[in-house]
Amino acid sequence: MSAVRSSLAAVLLLAAAACRHERRPALRLWALGREGEVVAQLLPDLARRRPGLRVRVQQIPWSAAHEKLLTAFVGGAMPDVLQVGNTWLPELVALGALEPLDHRLARSVAVRADDYFPGILAANVIDGVTYGVPWYVDTRLLFYRTDLLAAAGFARPPTTWAGWLAALPRMQAAAGPGNWAILLPLREWEPPVILGMQWGAGLLRDGDRYGDFESPAFRAAFAFYLDFFHRGLAPLGDTAVVNVYQDFARGTFSVYLTGPWNLGEFARRLPAALAERWGTTPLPAPDGTAPGVSLAGGSSLVVARSSPRKDDAWALVEYLAEPAQQVQFYRLTGDLPARRSAWEAADLPADARARAFWLQLQHVRPTPKIPEWERIASAIARYGEAAIRGEMGIDGALEALDRDVDRVLEKRRWLLAQPRR
């Protein structure tokens, strides 16, 4: 009888444990855009490894993500794990919304710092503390028509900006009258910032307290940027290019400064006749030390400081960071992996078009890691467009840009001036 009672008690204990197991709430993961649509397809293997760890994915459109993140923080409704664009990370760190990860990274076998592109990893470190694990990477380089470059008399892409300035008018002529050489969308801040970095500009000064856009280095880069438009190499209006892919195929423009998402888009959208007539190349440099530097972009996975289940949240981050998951994620989304071992597993460096990104990612830098960067970037684009259209001169545009940036950074200066406690 005693044995029967013992067996019954054991069964009841197991049942109670199972009930508690089932009632355990799901870990919440917020993922953005296309990534949020497909990440659930990576999770079945995690469920097999850790039966008690359930994950509920919420997909958030990129257009609504920034406001939703801030609203969730204010309302105390942050998820456990979230995807964050690299330029948003400093803002969430300043709010105290994110969990520092260095102590977990130091013990992790799955996440190895030496397997990441250094410039991308650096974008996740704020004031010496790591807050994010890169999930996928993004940077900018040149897509170009190989046939038009050859028609211009160049066997391979130039590695200096001087070389491209010689090639672009010839490519434009080879494409025929009424066309342009290069597409640099007017409302993008990235081209002048990339050129500024290549020319050695710091963008901000005095500990990121003031704008530094009137510096000789940025002024030279900005003048070089404007020259593409003033020489008729790049279109001045948004209506000149109606459909990027159709116009690239027609030769409306021959070169495009853009990112890795267009690897898949070009392959899908260009006509079959152009399948072997386009390529990618790392950015040139002003002085011949190619590749020139580009931006350290992409998205990272972070753990909310408010999460009551930080160990489980970190387990999810580690899982999604595994090279095998990175490869599968690349196949689902076209997003370039953040880990170099995942690139090799997917044989990406062997693909000539992807290899250009592999090379470029060895030469990337993050934008200034301050919460105000998004507002500063918008101001750069605004004054850049005004100068392109001839509404402002170079000096007037940069003076106004510095003035606006100094206003944006006013609170930062005040906070940094306070005595440390």
Regions found by a protein language model. Give the residues of each.
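Glycine-centered hinge/linker elements that transmit conformational signals in sensory
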Residues: 168-170, 207-238, 283
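Long, aromatic- and glycine/proline-rich binding clefts that accommodate carbohydrate-like moieties
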Residues: 119, 278-282, 330-382, 386, ...
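A structural signal for short loop-to-beta-strand junctions that line the ligand-binding cleft
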Residues: 71, 79-80, 109-148, 180-181, ...
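Extracytoplasmic/periplasmic solute-binding protein
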Residues: 127-135, 140, 165-211, 253
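Extracytoplasmic/periplasmic substrate-recognition and gating elements
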Residues: 152, 223-235, 243, 268-335, ...
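Short, solvent-exposed loop/beta-turn-alpha elements that line the ligand-binding surface or hinge
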Residues: 102-116, 181-182, 201-220, 268-273, ...
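Extracytoplasmic "Venus flytrap"/periplasmic binding protein-like
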Residues: 45-116, 125, 150-152, 156-159, ...
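Hinge/lid segment of periplasmic solute-binding proteins
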Residues: 86-141, 165, 196, 275-281, ...
